[in-house]
Structure formats: structure tokens, C-alpha cells
């Protein structure tokens, strides 16, 4: 469990539990 909302550059996608500084998104 981490963040559910991604930063602006990932907006509209799902964030991985490593959403801290650079969030990685999966489609």
C-alpha cells in the first residue's frame, strides 16, 4: 500500500507503491 494518486506527469494512471519522488505508473 502506497499512494493511489500519481503526480502530474502520471495523471490519469495508476501509481505503484513507490510513489514518492519519481512515481512509476502502469497502464
Curated annotation (Swiss-Prot):
Expressed by the venom gland. It comes from the Eukaryota. It is found in: Secreted. One of its GO terms (molecular function) is potassium channel regulator activity. InterPro entries: Scorpion_toxin-like_sf, Toxin_alpha-KTx_8/9. Keywords: Disulfide bond, Ion channel impairing toxin, Potassium channel impairing toxin, Secreted, Toxin, Voltage-gated potassium channel impairing toxin. Disulfide bonds join 3-19, 6-23, 10-25. One of its GO terms (cellular component) is extracellular region. The keyword Cytoplasm does not apply. Has the structural arrangement of an alpha-helix connected to a beta-sheet by disulfide bonds (CSalpha/beta). May play a role in blocking voltage-gated potassium channels Kv1.2/KCNA2, Kv1.3/KCNA3 and Kv1.6/KCNA6 to a lesser extent. Negative results: has no effect on rat Kv1.1/KCNA1, Kv1.4/KCNA4 and Kv1.5/KCNA5 voltage-gated potassium channels. Belongs to the short scorpion toxin superfamily. Potassium channel inhibitor family. Alpha-KTx 09 subfamily. This is Potassium channel toxin alpha-KTx 9.11. The lineage of its organism: Eukaryota, Metazoa, Ecdysozoa, Arthropoda, Chelicerata.
Amino acid at each position: 500500500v502506497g499512494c493511489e494518486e500519481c503526480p502530474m506527469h502520471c495523471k490519469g494512471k495508476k501509481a505503484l507503491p513507490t510513489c514518492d519522488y519519481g512515481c512509476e505508473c502502469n497502464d
